[in-house]
Structures are given as C-alpha cells and as structure tokens.
A protein has these predicted regions:
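The conserved 3'-phosphoadenosine-5'-phosphosulfate
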Residues: 43, 170-274, 292-300
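Hydrophobic/aromatic beta-strand patches that form the interior of the parallel beta-sheet core
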Residues: 81, 107-109, 180-182
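Active-site rim elements
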Residues: 51-56, 84-85, 154-163, 183-185, ...
Length: 300
C-alpha cells in the first residue's frame, strides 16, 4: 500500500473521545491526519461505510480518488491515519472496504465508553443538531423501527445498538492483527499515558501532552448556534478586549456569556439507567472476556 494512504484508523466508538484523540495524535510531528485545516474539509472521511450512510449523512467521501487526495500531503510521515466513528458500527462494510483499499496490515484503534453513558451522550449530541425531538426514553423505545423506517435519519440515533460493542470489536480483532482498545475512562483520567500508548502502538516517539489540553467530554449545549459561533470566534476580538478590560473582568465576562447562553445536557432517570444496564449486561460481560479487561464498573 502507498505510504500516502492511512496505515492506522480510529474506528470508534462515537461519543467516546475519538475527536480528542484525533487532535492529540495529529499534533505529533510524525503523524498526519486529515482535518478541517489546510483546505481539507473532511475530518471524518467515512469512505469505507459510504453505502451504509448514504442519504443519512451529508459530509463524507464517496470515491477512492477523493479519499486519496485527503492524504496527498502525508508522504514522509511514519503514521498516517483518520478517524471515522461509523466504521465500528457498520463494521461489516467497513472491514471489507478497509481490506480492499488499505490491505490487511492496517492498525486499528478503538475507544470504548460505558454504553449507558455513551447512549445519553449521543442523544444530547443529536439533540444539539435539532435532529431529535423525542425524549431520551421515547427515542430508545422505538430505536429499531425508527432507523429502519426512516432512510434519512442519522445513524447516531441508534443510541442503544451503537453500544453493543462485542460483535463489532470481535470482528475487528478477528480481521486485523494490530488492534488497540482504549477505555474512555482511562483516556479521560490518564490522557498523557493513553496518547503515548498510541504513539508506541504506531511505533513513533512519545510526546508530552500539555496540561492545559483536556479531553472534551461535553456537559452543556449552546441554546443558539449564533452564540456558539461568537464564543468560538472570540480570539478575533480578544486582542481588543485585552486593551480595555483587566483580566478578572474578562474572565467573569467569559463565564457569564458561557453560562447565559448554554443549557445543561439532559440527565438520565434512575429507572432508565437500570433498564439500560440490564440491556447491555450480557454484551458487556462478553466484551470483558474478549478484551481481557474488567468492565464491572459499567454495570453500576
């Protein structure tokens, strides 16, 4: 395979820290991953599951020539990769196409989050985009038929099914010789070690993760995209504010703006949590045995 194509993939799971890991890895001098910068508009190419997501997702690469162009500046880098979370859920199509286009020696990285927490996080994410108008309880009760009957709805509404990791992970382990599993909680609480373990896995030098860099775990959502844009683009007017306002005032202003125009994410009801723990119980046990990791804390 060409050195200007990926030799590793982050395949999921959705809402499990993949974007943060992507951002940490791509800062390494010997890593290339497509991003929104440098005229590359696709952060998640999703090329290997294009048939599964057609009509459901707007932003994806649908042909190999365009896929190759994403990595045209990667030549000379030791680690070339991309992160597309739907590769885990639609594993059958993904694995078939990964082998077809990238070969069998590709390295696979999988982040896994407590499926109960992941389900609610996905719900909050979809709600943010205004693609969800049901309550969490309503959505998970009709999930299967909803996805089957609506060919335009995002795969992200598979709040429960996307957390049934066992068969997905098993398929990747059986299909590729180099598969690295990272638990979301390990990534959150020991980010530096988790990222450097990935560097070791990719056979490149370690790098210290700056303390101010944090994994984005969410928590609040913007009440309006206009306010989100203003907040995210604050660097453009921060220079002016530094000239007219002292630091303590700027800090309070920043906190006020964030708290005023964001909303708390939905929280899970006790009975809903109990239902989901029971739903995932057997799959978690099977997964625990498969990856040889204690996952009992996911059942509490």
């Amino acid at each position: 395979m060409s050195k200007c194509l990926p030799n590793f993939l982050i395949v999921g799971a959705a809402k499990s820290g993949t974007s943060s890991l992507h951002n940490f890895l791509r800062k390494h001098y010997d890593v290339f991953m497509p991003n929104y910068n440098y005229n590359i508009k696709v952060k998640e190419p999703r090329f290997f599951v294009k048939n599964s997501i057609a009509g459901r997702v707007n932003n994806y690469v649908d042909n190999f020539e365009d896929y190759k162009k994403l990595f045209s500046k990667s030549c000379g880098k030791s680690a070339v990769g991309e992160a597309s979370v739907f590769y885990l859920y639609f594993f059958k199509e993904a694995i078939r196409n990964i082998k077809k286009y990238l070969g069998n020696d590709i390295k696979i990285i999988i982040l896994l989050r407590n499926p109960v927490e992941r389900a609610l996080s996905a719900y909050n994410h979809v709600s943010r985009t205004k693609s969800e108008n049901l309550s969490f309880e309503e959505a998970i009760s009709i999930e299967d038929n909803r996805f089957k009957n609506n060919k335009n709805i995002t795969p992200m509404i598979n709040y429960k099914n996307m957390g049934l990791y066992y068969k997905m992970v098993k398929a990747y382990i059986e299909s590729f010789k180099d598969v690295k599993i990272i638990l979301f909680e390990d990534f959150i609480y020991n980010t530096n070690k988790s990222v450097n373990d990935c560097f070791d896995f990719l056979k490149i030098s370690n790098m210290k993760i700056l303390k101010e860099e944090k994994v984005n775990v969410g928590g609040r959502k913007w009440s309006n995209n206009f306010y989100k844009t203003i907040y995210n683009e604050k660097k453009h007017y921060l220079t002016f504010l530094k000239k007219v306002l002292p630091l303590n005032i700027r800090t309070k202003l920043n906190e006020w703006f964030y708290n005023e125009f964001t909303l708390e994410n939905k929280r899970m009801k006790k009975q809903t949590k109990e239902y989901l723990i029971n739903f995932f119980k057997e799959d978690i046990k099977s997964l625990s045995s498969l990856i040889n990791k204690d996952l009992n804390h996911w059942l509490k």
